[in-house]
Design a protein with these regions (language model features):
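Jelly-roll (double-stranded beta-helix
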Residues: 1-320
Length: 320
């Protein structure tokens, strides 16, 4: 169950779409691949891998963690590690994660919260289970998105934005069948709380069985829909989509997703009814990409410099 819910979505502002719009067709649907990250937790990753970086640009990576039920003393996280050249956006649907960084920041990312960290010139951080989760176990479900920075912002000072659940912009469709949690960017004249260096739109949408959502979409942006759970269709042509799949849209100025009317049985995430989907897109940066581990730069020389700077302690030190 998503962390931020509303008993009656019809009390929320509704996303309206003009009549003379051009629906974006679905250019492809891609399956995620399975990966092991951090200290051994499992993720589903649609990109990089299923689609090329030129397709996901300005995003480089999307990981879905869980949903998983941890037994006591079973949960693991991502110990201290560096980043440079991009932003990490960690969104927690269920459970909680503790985080710390080399600039003295820290706290707990709770259900419905988003941690928006601009690594920029460089920072060290960790994301680990809280003491409560370690002791008692519990459900964990989250998403991490890497947003690239253009070359002139690769060395911008590190920044942290704690976007708590109560600050999300909540919207709905004209019939109230969709709950839209706008994390960043603009949808139909409404803005999310995230302050982005790179122009993007990022939203978490839950659709009731059979419900449809059509949203206006910046024609200069790319557009993708990633299925967190459930089954449904994407685009005006109703391409089937299911859990852990990424739908990539072609040109146009509206995006449509629809939940299956009756699913009949639970999918791999345990979701038998609703369609849970991330809508994301942004203005492509269209610059060369050099990637190595936790660094995302433009050239191999910049990657080598990042490694040298990390080894020299120039990206920060782990607090004692």
């Amino acid at each position: 169950m998503p962390a931020v819910t509303v008993d009656n979505p019809l009390v929320l502002p509704r996303i309206e779409v003009a009549a003379d719009t051009q629906p974006r067709p679905v250019s492809g649907v891609y399956a995620s691949h399975h990966a092991i990250e951090g200290a051994g937790f499992e993720v589903w990753r649609p990109f990089p891998g299923a689609v090329d970086a030129t397709v996901s640009d300005p995003f480089f990576l999307l990981d879905q963690l869980g949903p998983v039920e941890y037994a006591p003393h079973e949960a693991v996280g991502a110990p201290w590690h560096p980043h440079r050249g991009f932003e990490t956006v960690t969104y927690v649907l269920d459970g909680e994660i503790a985080h710390h960084d080399s600039n003295g920041g820290g706290g707990v990312i709770g259900e419905g919260d988003t941690q928006w960290m601009t690594a920029g010139s460089g920072i060290l951080h960790d994301e680990v289970p809280t003491e409560r989760v370690l002791a008692s176990g519990g459900r964990s479900h989250g998403v991490q998105l890497w947003v690239n920075l253009p070359s002139h912002l690769k060395f911008t000072p590190p920044r942290y934005q704690p976007l708590t659940a109560d600050h999300l912009t909540l919207l709905t469709s004209p019939d109230g069948g969709a709950l839209v949690r706008l994390i960043a960017g603009e949808l139909g004249g409404h803005r999310g709380p995230g302050d982005t260096h790179t122009p993007i739109t990022y939203a978490h949408v839950t659709l009731s069985p059979g419900a449809q959502l059509t949203v206006p979409w910046n024609p200069a942006f790319n557009a993708m829909a990633y299925v967190l759970g459930g089954r449904g269709h994407a685009g005006a042509e109703a391409r089937p989509i299911t859990a852990h799949e990424l739908a990539v849209f072609g040109p146009g100025d509206t995006v449509t997703v629809r939940a299956a009317a009756v699913s009949g049985s639970a999918d791999a995430t345990g979701n038998a009814d609703e369609l849970d989907v991330l809508l994301l897109g942004g203005l492509p940066i269209r610059e060369p990409i050099a990637h190595y581990g936790p660094f995302l730069m433009n050239t191999k020389a910049e990657i080598l410099q990042a490694i040298d700077d990390f080894n020299a302690g120039k990206l920060g030190t782990v607090p004692s």
